Amino acid sequence: MGQIQYSEKYFDDTYEYRHVVLPPEVAKLLPKNRLLSENEWRAIGVQQSRGWVHYAIHRPEPHIMLFRRPLNFQQQQEAAAAAAAQMLPK
């Protein structure tokens, strides 16, 4: 069985992006005309940190999944968690 391959991250002013190349035996599990939820892409074996969204299908190469998430997503999540922790009674 082939391995799932992950690109390096790349960026624009709003998002960070990455693409994931699926081996043929995994790619055949993809639905043809819709994007996958996080639970669905995790179920087929894609492993990434939180916040990534399957945002587009590149029709000529449907075995390549395109993902994006807002810039600084992880820092925003950490800041929100720290703020919530400060609100807990001591």
UniProtKB/Swiss-Prot annotation:
SMART domains for the chain: CKS
Keyword list, A-Z: Cell cycle, Cell division
State the Gene Ontology BP annotations. cell division; regulation of mitotic cell cycle
Look up the record and report any one GO term of the cellular component aspect: cyclin-dependent protein kinase holoenzyme complex
InterPro entries in alphabetical order: Cyclin-dep_kinase_reg-sub, Cyclin-dep_kinase_reg-sub_sf
A molecular-function term among this protein's GO annotations: ubiquitin binding
Enumerate the SUPFAM superfamilies for this protein: Cell cycle regulatory proteins
Q: Please give the function described in this protein's UniProt entry.
A: Binds to the catalytic subunit of the cyclin dependent kinases and is essential for their biological function.
**Family assignment from sequence similarity:** Belongs to the CKS family.
Q: Which PANTHER family match?
A: CYCLIN-DEPENDENT KINASES REGULATORY SUBUNIT/60S RIBOSOME SUBUNIT BIOGENESIS PROTEIN NIP7
Full protein name: Cyclin-dependent kinases regulatory subunit 1
Species the sequence originates in: Oryza sativa subsp. japonica
